[in-house]
Structure formats: C-alpha cells, structure tokens
Regions:
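N-terminal hydrophobic or amphipathic segments with adjacent small-residue motifs
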Residues: 13, 21, 97-99
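Basic, amphipathic DNA-recognition helix from helix-turn-helix-like DNA-binding domains
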Residues: 1-16
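Short, ordered coil/turn segments that flank beta-strands lining enzyme active or ligand-binding pockets
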Residues: 25
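Intrinsically disordered, low-complexity protein-interaction/activation regions
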Residues: 37, 108-112
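Positively charged, aromatic-enriched patches within helix-turn-helix-type DNA-binding elements
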Residues: 28-97, 102-104
Length: 112
C-alpha cells in the first residue's frame, strides 16, 4: 500500500511525453541521455507544452501565460526560450521536439 501511494505521488509530480519527463517539483527535464534543471521561464514554457502536447500554441499565448503583462517581453523572447529548450532536448536525446508551425505558433511533437 505504501509503495502504491508513493508511486501515485511521483506520477503527479512528473509529466511525460515520448521518452521525456518534466518533474514539476524540481524543474528537472530528463530523457535517456541525461537531464537538465531548467530555469524558471524555461520550466514554465516547457510545462505549457508538456500539458498541451500536439497542440499548436501561438507565441502570444506563451507570452500571456508566462510573462507579466507589464513586461517588455516580445515574440523574439519566446523564440529565444524555445531555442534554449530545443538545444536541451537534443542534448538529452529526447525523442520529442518543439516544432515551429509557420504563421501559427509552436507545437510539441514526437520526432519522426
């Protein structure tokens, strides 16, 4: 019983997609090739994608969800953070990627 409860707790703290996991308590992104502890904005961006896999998310939605409305963040800020995450996903040999959907936004997909 204790093991079952412990496993339930671990599952609620981790989002998985493909071979990649995001721990919502430690901000750790992991896959078979290793792991990274993400910075706050990287974590929030990755969390948005992990909660909405295969959904096209416009950069305006990323901005609204993660940055303060009074901040000076723009679309190029989102692009920068997505580029950081893409590099980290590649480095840990994740089988998922953040794809650009030209004119629409970004989506988290399993690599083909």
């Amino acid at each position: 019983r204790v093991l079952t409860r412990k496993n339930d707790i671990q599952q609620t703290n981790t989002l998985t997609f493909g071979n990649t996991a995001l721990n919502t308590e430690t901000f750790e992104l992991s896959a078979p090739g290793g792991s990274y502890k993400l910075a706050n904005k990287e974590y929030q961006t990755m969390l948005l994608f992990m909660r909405n896999p295969k959904v096209v998310i416009p950069s305006s939605r990323v901005l609204e969800n993660i940055w303060d409305p009074d901040s000076k963040a723009e679309d190029n800020t989102v692009w920068t953070y997505i580029s950081y995450l893409r590099r980290k996903l590649e480095a840990i040999k994740a089988d998922i990627e953040i794809r650009t959907m030209r004119g629409a936004g970004y989506t988290l997909e399993v690599r083909k």
